[in-house]
């Protein structure tokens, strides 16, 4: 769970507290600290690790890092090490962090792996790109930054079987989608990957990332195996403690409530768009997504202008959302907030 450099055999030490230049172990012994504040394993990281292992069925072992970008980078790296292969299959408009995204424009900061890019939800196109030299397939069970496009269950089932057949690694990026079901969208779809990456809200507002999977893959990081997972702040006490607290707050009932509000908002926006569209014309705006995640799409020649108009109109109505049309319902939103936003969209379409 911790950076490799804080582990040592035969008796790894867990730190309970620190003061001045001293640290105290869990068994009460105080040590003069010459570790340059590198820290060490702490109680909260064990609690958070258990929370995540209990919550996500595909995770038998988990390791922590500082962001979703790091989590995906580490997952891809260990998948290549585990399989001994280099090629990775990704999907158009997939976003897996600062160094692994595949939008409309080439990203000069992408890590230089051997990527092949398939069309999301397109089984036939993906079949064409499958090969026995693939190390991994990585995808979100719902495209997030790519427009809140849910995966078709049959598409995920196809990928699961294909990866099993070629003995590669299937990675679900659930950094966003894990908030949509208490056990992640993998459980909603009943399709389970070999590895799962996590981040964002699971750190309780602090920098956080995590990646985990089955024992065989995660054992590649065991001492003596030669694969080093470093990071001074991987298991920092603030993120671990905030993550534990957030995990206790995020209950199945609260997720269901947020999802219901998101469904209502999505339906309301689509209804407003249809109500005010000129006769024999297509609605200018379409809301997609799943549960508490809503994505706005614009049609026609003036898509960017329309997107900007919606954003600034909503700001004028004291409603703040992502400029690209990214809307996330959280645990403290109530039905009257959703009604307010739907009425704001009514006002926008009336003025339009």
Q: Where do the language-model regions lie?
A:
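Conserved N-terminal phosphate-binding loop of PLP-dependent enzymes in the Aspartate aminotransferase
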Residues: 1-352
